[in-house]
Amino acid sequence: MPELQADELIRRTLAGERVPLARALSWVENEHPNATALLDACFGRTGGAFRLGITGPPGAGKSTLVTQLAKEYRARGEKVAVVAVDPTSPFSGGALLGDRVRMNELSGDDGVFIRSMATRGSMGGLAVHTAQACDVLDAAGFERILIETVGVGQSELEVAQTADSTAVVLVPESGDAVQAMKAGLMEIADLFVINKSDREGADRAAQAIRSALHLRARTSEWVIPVLLTAASIGRGVNELVEAFERHLAWLTETGTLERRRRQRLEQRLESLVRERLWEDFRSQVPEGAWRDALATLGERRETPNRLAERLVRNGGPKPGPTEPREH
């Protein structure tokens, strides 16, 4: 496909054309100069898609479960996008886990679009990029967006929180129920899923989660379900879709969906403003002054708080006499 002008690529992306859409998502991920114009064009068309987060520890079968969820939603006539947040190989710079390899059952369906968001060695900013990619997919007409993350670290939890509804996927073995309580997953879960439930211990793991939920102070009227699935054979997938749809109905009826989305937009705005202010600040501080500031800090001649205050106020450290240090 020949190179398109920015406005033409944006127009065709909003029309749902797959190749321009893929290029548009690359703009977002790589912070292309045209990404801002793209996102501005998309924003007014967002809000129609239900964004589902799928998170949990590695090895929980999330990719297989996401594939089955996409197939079930397609059977119901919904257009589905999958955003798979993958680790990146430090050698090749590409996604270590190829989403099209894992989800090749979906590749022939024009109603499904699959995209990796690679971490490129750092999770910084990935939650913002994921939310922006979902905006593009939302504006392009996808009705269900599945956001899969690879683990349960803080950054993965931030990515999961870009969703309207989040399912935490665990397996019967390895004390996942205990880990869920330790890793803060209780706070972000709208649904719990015990996948690979054809293995021994699935009922016991589900009961452990239910007991933990019962002991926890309720923060809303939504009763968090604990579901059993065996994604490799398709068992329990229909029930999981029904649970997601019940949660969407509850979110909508109670006004919680609107509140969550407003809160996410506020967090996103705050993150973008912080990023812009930092960029402006660093552009105003000469490199030599910045190095002097770091040296001042490293030699314990000034505290971080005092130095930060002075840098912000003056745009750089004031040179002064350096007292000899005792050895």
Indicate where each model-derived feature is located.
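A general structural signal for well-ordered alpha-helical segments in protein cores
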Residues: 6, 21-22, 35, 206, ...
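Nucleotide-state-sensitive switch-loop elements of NTP-binding domains
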Residues: 4-55, 60, 66-155, 162-177
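Flexible active-site lid/hinge loop adjacent to a nucleotide/diphosphate
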Residues: 159, 172-200
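Canonical P-loop GTPase G-domain recognition
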Residues: 191, 197-250
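Alpha-helical scaffold elements adjacent to nucleotide-binding pockets in ATP/GTP-utilizing enzyme cores
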Residues: 96, 133, 158, 162, ...
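Long, well-ordered amphipathic alpha-helical subdomains in the mid-to-C-terminal portions
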Residues: 228, 239-315
